Amino acid sequence: LGNNIPEICEAIGSDVAYDKTTFSAYETEAVYEAMDKERKNVLICGIEAHICVLQTAIDLKAAGYQPVIVADCVSSRKELDKELGLKRAEQEGILITSKEAILFELTRKAGGPVFKQISALIK
């Protein structure tokens, strides 16, 4: 439903794009096949929090994954729609966090090169 942002493709070292005509990314065959069935936690960032992000999270939860929506990495055209999408996700038992919280949760400890890189990113 849109193009990839060049800066994101550069940062992750890939410009892989999947055709997506469904609102839920999990209903896209290429995304479904690319999912690592051994990993159960899925971080979700994207646009239209009240539609695409929400439906993807609900589908992932139904499939046995633990979706985690990164609230400051999602948006909607209207702020109210974003707020309602996040509220609905929370009502569905989906975890909501911030980019800073999840980055430090994944880092696990202070000190070292990874901590320094993450700290520099969020300042």
What positions do the PLM features span?
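Active-site-adjacent betaalpha module
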Residues: 1-123
